[in-house]
Amino acid sequence: MSEEMQYEYLVPLEKYLSAGVRLGTRLSNKYLEDRGFIFAVRPDGLRIFDIKKIDERLKIAARFIARYPPDRVLVHTTRPYGFKPVQMFCKYVGCKALTGRFIPGTLTNPNLPHYQEADLLFVVDPKLDAQAVAEAAKMGVPVIALVDTDTPHQYIDFMIPCNNKGRKSLALIFWILARQVLRERGELKPDQDLPVPPEEFETRLVQT
């Protein structure tokens, strides 16, 4: 039996594929290429992530997050499709959610009313969330980030390569992480799921 057949994914491979988790952009970051995160390039130029590496990084990230007191972990996104996944993740894991604009000084100026203390920052897109990443670096706060093929890697301590733009991808990623963090803490059994499916983490499109 091949190593690929023996590897146990956190969710069935088909779930990753249907959610578009492995789909990158047409731009490529050599830093990610050199680390083997980018598996292939489609004829249309779209970069494809290695799903096994995504899965492996999710397992490591969950162990890392589980080491911190939940109220010392700040999860931030300015990407609208990330609002619901981040809020649901924080609901189940107990972390602090910060969605929308990141006000300068949030991590660096304790005199501001919106000041937040954190021992770990988790961002959805380091390009859009650059202010938060820069402030975390200044304060010595480690940063976990979802990174697409076009994402800069500066100041990121741990990268999770994935499609960090799609609704379904973000929902599945945060659902997996929430479940895995709770398993790492012993709050869920190793074979136990969250009480809601990944679809409940998904941002709903509003019909106009």
From Swiss-Prot:
Q: Which Pfam families match?
A: Ribosomal_S2
> Does Ribosomal protein appear among the keywords?
yes
Q: Which GO terms describe its cellular component?
A: small ribosomal subunit
Q: Does Ribosomal protein appear among the keywords? A: yes
Recorded coiled-coil stretches:
none
Q: Which InterPro entries match?
A: Ribosomal_uS2, Ribosomal_uS2_arc, Ribosomal_uS2_euk/arc, Ribosomal_uS2_flav_dom_sf
Region feature (Disordered): 189-208
Show the GO MF annotations: structural constituent of ribosome
Q: What UniProt keywords apply to this chain's record, in alphabetical order?
A: Ribonucleoprotein, Ribosomal protein
Annotated GO biological process = translation
Family (UniProt): Belongs to the universal ribosomal protein uS2 family.
- Report the PANTHER family cross-referenced here: 40S RIBOSOMAL PROTEIN SA
> What is the name of this protein?
Small ribosomal subunit protein uS2
Protein's organism: Pyrobaculum arsenaticum (strain DSM 13514 / JCM 11321 / PZ6)
